[in-house]
């Protein structure tokens, strides 16, 4: 394992038990947690993106703010729902945030997850083309986004512009060259992982996927990663791909940890449906003393296959506690798994 970061779902609720009671709380604490994680030596700060929910949504203002406050840590998403995105406008936003961060963005994109509303992308002005599903539309938006990130001119210039143009067709500005290689696809199935490999995207595999074989979650996820790497090699890309997996992992160090996570729940995979047609398997959580955690995680085949591990954090418990969660893993667990 080469890198470890955190993944925040960015929840807020007006409950008195929550440390994030407003959108402002969540946004500002997300920045502070990224700063704290960098100081602790973590490698990445990643954020979920959900629309129509009390969670983080359009991510680029947050990513830019984190980029301005940090200097080393990778900054990313897991994932942006491409059904909601104007891919050209997204190139401009993503490039601006990447330039502010000095080329540290790692953008996870996908077709999205189950929504809070029915066909929410329609309210954003998007419709699948005739014969397209909404998932097809998301993948089409993704391919346009990837093409535009190449930085090639495509727009006919005005012969009488307000400001002088460079020669030839014009491209989107700003375009951050190099960001194209730091785009990840959140794949929920083996087929979409292979598709992502062919297009030269890195792979994000989360805490759930389509249940394709009935095997344990980590076994299926490891097989997905191997299929992805084989497709990448077959495609003949010049660089090595990156692969991340997400896990809920808590080292029980003190009484707070045991009170929050020491109840033994969710220690087995769960089966459910992410839509009426798709049976899904949800990966287990891990919560134990560090020596027990190390042995459990060594048996996780997908963690062994990946180069990046994202720790899902309970952001509503506040910056100080989540920094403690990250530090406990980095100090007491990660070195035994080959990190650093």
Indicate residue ranges for each PLM-predicted region:
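Active-site mouth loops of central-metabolism enzymes
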Residues: 12-28, 80-87, 177-187, 280-291
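Glycine-rich, proline-tolerant flexible connector loops at the mouths of alpha/beta enzymes
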Residues: 44-66, 207-218, 310-323
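Alpha-helix-loop-beta-strand connector modules within alpha/beta enzyme cores
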Residues: 56-80, 327-340
């Amino acid at each position: 394992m080469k890198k470890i970061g955190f993944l925040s779902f960015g929840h807020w609720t007006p409950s008195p038990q929550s440390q994030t009671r407003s959108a402002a709380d969540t946004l500002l604490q997300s920045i502070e947690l990224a700063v704290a994680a960098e100081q602790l030596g973590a490698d990445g700060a990643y954020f979920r993106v959900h629309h129509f929910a009390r969670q983080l949504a359009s991510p680029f203002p947050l990513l830019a703010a984190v980029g301005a406050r940090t200097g080393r840590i990778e900054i990313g998403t897991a994932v942006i729902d491409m059904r909601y995105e104007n891919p050209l406008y997204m190139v401009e936003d993503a490039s601006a945030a990447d330039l502010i961060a000095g080329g540290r963005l790692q953008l996870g994109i996908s077709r999205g997850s189950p929504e809070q509303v029915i066909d929410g992308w329609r309210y954003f002005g998007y419709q699948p083309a005739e014969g397209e599903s909404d998932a097809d539309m998301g993948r089409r938006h993704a391919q346009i986004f990837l093409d535009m990130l190449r930085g090639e001119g495509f727009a006919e210039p005005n012969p009488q512009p307000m400001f002088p143009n460079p020669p030839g067709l014009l491209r989107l500005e700003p375009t951050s060259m190099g960001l194209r290689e730091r785009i990840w696809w959140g794949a929920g199935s083996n087929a979409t992982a292979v598709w992502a490999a062919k297009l030269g995207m890195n792979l994000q595999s989360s805490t759930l996927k389509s249940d394709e074989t009935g095997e344990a979650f980590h076994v299926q996820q490891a097989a997905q990663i191997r299929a992805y790497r084989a497709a990448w090699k077959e495609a003949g890309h010049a660089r090595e791909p990156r692969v991340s997996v997400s896990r809920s992992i808590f080292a029980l160090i003190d009484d707070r940890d045991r009170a929050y996570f020491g109840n033994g729940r969710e220690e087995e995979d769960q089966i459910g449906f992410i839509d009426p047609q798709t049976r899904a398997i949800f990966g287990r959580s891990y919560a134990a003393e560090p020596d027990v955690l190390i042995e459990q995680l060594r048996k996780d085949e997908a963690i062994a296959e990946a180069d990046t591990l994202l720790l899902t954090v309970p952001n509503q418990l506040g910056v100080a506690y989540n920094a403690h969660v990250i530090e406990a893993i980095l100090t007491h667990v990660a070195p035994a798994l080959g990190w650093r």
